[in-house]
């Protein structure tokens, strides 16, 4: 069983409040999507508007602190978080999608999975070289998708100012895989 760490030194009051909210609004689903996996279900958070608002507010603070001009959400649950953050900031939203889900010209990045590869895409004109982009997702686990997203955005000249996630699973190598990207988890498990 994993434990949830206490807030790290130097965290803001909003981050601490978000961590407290997350502790009470994440449900563990045993053996899903396969045996041996404990899935971190965020639907209790999504179904509680006040709690969701606290978490979105903390993510907005992360974006502001880093001077983000664009918010990029990683499919699929990253969209649920990135869209309200971008809206509150008046910032552009860039969806990072699975291959074949975006119409028109795209840029892509392929990355390794345990058994095979996967590809993510953005619209070819989604990001300009002068933009400061904050990546947003629900969980940092192995880091494959986040590393590919970082490479995709950096490859078009954008400055990726960080990766903000609800949860970092510290027992998995995600942080190492996305290094030197600044990882900002609201909660570390």
UniProtKB/Swiss-Prot annotation:
Reactions catalysed: AMP + diphosphate = 5-phospho-alpha-D-ribose 1-diphosphate + adenine
Molecular function terms from GO: adenine binding; adenine phosphoribosyltransferase activity; AMP binding
Domain of life: Bacteria
Entry-linked CDD domains: PRTases_typeI (cd06223)
Assigned GO CC terms: cytoplasm
Secretion signal span: none
EC number: 2.4.2.7
Keywords assigned: Cytoplasm, Glycosyltransferase, Purine salvage, Transferase
GO BP annotations listed: adenine salvage; AMP salvage; purine ribonucleoside salvage
Major localization listed first in the record, in broad terms: cytoplasm
Protein localization: Cytoplasm
Listed pathway(s): Purine metabolism; AMP biosynthesis via salvage pathway; AMP from adenine: step 1/1
Function: Catalyzes a salvage reaction resulting in the formation of AMP, that is energically less costly than de novo synthesis.
UniProt similarity note: Belongs to the purine/pyrimidine phosphoribosyltransferase family.
Subunit description: Homodimer.
Alphabetized HAMAP family for the sequence: Aden_phosphoribosyltr
UniProt protein name: Adenine phosphoribosyltransferase
Species of provenance: Frankia alni (strain DSM 45986 / CECT 9034 / ACN14a)
């Amino acid at each position: 069983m994993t434990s949830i760490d206490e807030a790290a030194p130097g965290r803001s009051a909003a981050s601490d409040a978000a961590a407290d909210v997350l502790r009470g609004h994440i449900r563990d689903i045993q053996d899903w999507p396969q045996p041996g996996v404990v899935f971190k279900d965020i639907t209790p958070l999504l179904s509680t508007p006040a709690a969701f608002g606290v978490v979105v507010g903390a993510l907005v603070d992360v974006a502001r602190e880093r001077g983000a001009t664009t918010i990029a959400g990683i499919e699929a649950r990253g969209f649920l978080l990135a869209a309200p953050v971008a809206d509150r900031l008046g910032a552009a939203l860039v969806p990072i999608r699975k291959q074949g889900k975006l119409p028109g010209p795209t840029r892509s990045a392929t990355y390794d999975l345990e058994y095979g590869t996967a590809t993510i895409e953005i619209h070819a004109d989604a990001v300009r070289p002068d933009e400061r982009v904050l990546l947003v997702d629900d969980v940092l686990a192995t880091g494959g998708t986040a590393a590919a997203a970082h490479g995709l955005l950096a490859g078009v000249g954008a400055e990726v100012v960080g990766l903000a996630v609800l949860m970092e699973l510290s027992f998995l190598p995600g942080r190492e895989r996305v290094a030197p990207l600044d990882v900002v988890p609201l909660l570390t498990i």
